[in-house]
């Protein structure tokens, strides 16, 4: 990803909001989907104003291939920007991928101290 990184030794900001996208991908397009998502889509969405980070995961025990992308946001306004609107969508995969998405607001957090 090409987004800004914190200086060495500093932590990334802790997001108050997450934008989560879950997708079920047919096996016949999975390789092309992953290449496009990892190399094109994730960086272009992650570089939108108000996006702090972007990661993808695959479900280890799913029947069918389920993926999730988790974007940390400064605020829910990030997904309402013109830049995001211009970059969102599934490109050539439109109509082939089942998905759902939502913005989640942080209600609690915990980070263990290690020593």
Summary of predicted features, one role per range:
Residues 2-115:
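Macromolecular interaction modules
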């Amino acid at each position: 990803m090409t987004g800004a990184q914190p200086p060495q030794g500093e932590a990334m900001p802790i997001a108050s909001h997450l934008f989560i996208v879950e997708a079920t991908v047919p096996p016949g397009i999975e390789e092309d989907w992953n290449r496009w998502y990892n190399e094109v889509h994730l960086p272009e969405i992650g570089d939108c104003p108000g996006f702090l980070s972007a990661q993808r995961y695959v479900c280890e025990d799913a029947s069918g291939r389920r993926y999730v992308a988790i974007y940390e946001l400064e605020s829910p306004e990030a997904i309402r920007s013109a830049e995001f609107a211009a970059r969102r969508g599934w490109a050539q995969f439109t109509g082939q991928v089942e998905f759902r998405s939502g913005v989640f607001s942080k209600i609690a957090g915990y980070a263990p101290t290690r020593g």
